[in-house]
Curated annotation (Swiss-Prot):
Protein role: Cleaves 6-deoxy-6-sulfo-D-fructose 1-phosphate (SFP) to form dihydroxyacetone phosphate (DHAP) and 3-sulfolactaldehyde (SLA).
A molecular function GO annotation: 6-deoxy-6-sulfofructose-1-phosphate aldolase activity
Catalytic activity: 6-deoxy-6-sulfo-D-fructose 1-phosphate = (2S)-3-sulfolactaldehyde + dihydroxyacetone phosphate
Pfam families, per database record: DeoC
Active-site residue numbers: K193 (schiff-base intermediate with substrate)
Gene assigned in the entry: yihT
Protein name: Sulfofructosephosphate aldolase
KW Ligase (keyword) present: no
Organism from which the protein derives: Shigella flexneri
Length: 292
């Protein structure tokens, strides 16, 4: 059996410059907020995701797609550049309490064999981390996910995202990110996708210290995501995180959020978003070169 490794989703430099288009109801809300006619149809999301894959995958080492809105269409339309690997989201988002993702389970409809036949090289699992929920349940889900990936020769990517506790109102996001890393940073996955400390804001030295604390608890390669980080701050966030030990990024919003809802999205993705992704890829290569 052909077993993929993280080297199959990196750039030649060994760094990760990966694009996410697997947002689901959150993307629908972004279109609605941008003034798209309500209700925002599934086809609006699918078209945007497929167009993003076509326009941006030549500049990404991998692209993360979701089963619900674009995996089949991306495969059928050969939307992903040959130089770019495909990652498929293996998480099912369960809405509740007024938010689009209140809990997450492994998507039982996932077919790893088919994904591999379609050119997929990795799966991704979102793990919601709350201090007052059962750690063992999270660890068991990650273990099952890792086995699902590795038994089919696919790379396992976990994405712990912290949330306020179900009960009580005390929430220290920064400490929660560290606590999640302590719990899941040595869980047997191949790659850890993490929220940027301090939302990428503040003095560089503070960001670096926070990123180094994170690095101390993650015993596998790690990359940052861009949700909640101002897109103008994201290039710096990549530099700082990589100085601390990260190996790149897996991000969507910092690349394409600014064109959601604009006309001519194929053109916008090519003219506005592709240069951003190219620049981020250059930063990853530059930071990896410093390690040699």
């Amino acid at each position: 059996m052909n077993k993929y490794t993280i080297n199959d989703i990196t750039r030649a430099s060994g760094g990760f410059a990966m694009l996410a288009v697997d947002q689901r109801e959150a993307m629908r809300m972004m279109f609605a907020a941008a003034g798209a006619p309500a209700p925002v149809a599934d086809s609006v999301l699918t078209d945007f995701k497929v167009n993003a894959a076509k326009a941006l995958s030549p500049y990404a080492s991998a692209i993360l797609v979701d089963q619900q809105f674009c995996y089949r269409q991306v495969v059928e339309q050969n939307a992903i550049a040959k130089s770019c690997a495909m990652i498929v989201a293996a998480d099912e988002f369960i809405p509740g309490n007024g938010i689009p993702v209140d809990s997450v389970v492994i998507d039982r409809k996932i077919n790893p064999l088919q994904i591999k036949q379609d050119g997929g090289k990795a799966l991704k699992l979102l793990v919601l981390w709350r201090s007052d929920e059962d750690a063992q349940q999270r660890l068991d889900m990650v273990k099952e996910f890792n086995e699902l990936c590795h038994s089919h020769g696919l790379v396992s990517i976990i994405e712990p995202v912290v949330r306020p506790p179900r009960r009580g109102d005390k929430f220290d996001r920064e400490q929660a990110i560290i606590d999640a890393a302590k719990e899941l940073g040595d869980s047997g996955a191949d790659l850890y996708k993490v929220e940027m400390p301090l939302y990428g804001k503040g003095p560089q030295q503070e960001l670096l210290c926070a990123s180094q604390r994170l690095n101390d608890h993650i015993n596998m390669p790690w990359v940052i995501l861009s949700s909640s980080v101002d897109e103008k701050l994201f290039p710096r966030a990549v530099r700082v995180a990589m100085t601390a030990g990260a190996s790149g990024f897996l991000a969507g919003r910092a690349v394409w959020a600014s064109v959601v809802g604009l006309p001519d999205n194929e053109l916008m993705l090519r003219d506005v978003c592709a240069p951003k992704l190219q620049q981020l890829g250059d930063i990853v290569d530059e930071m990896m070169a410093k390690r040699r």
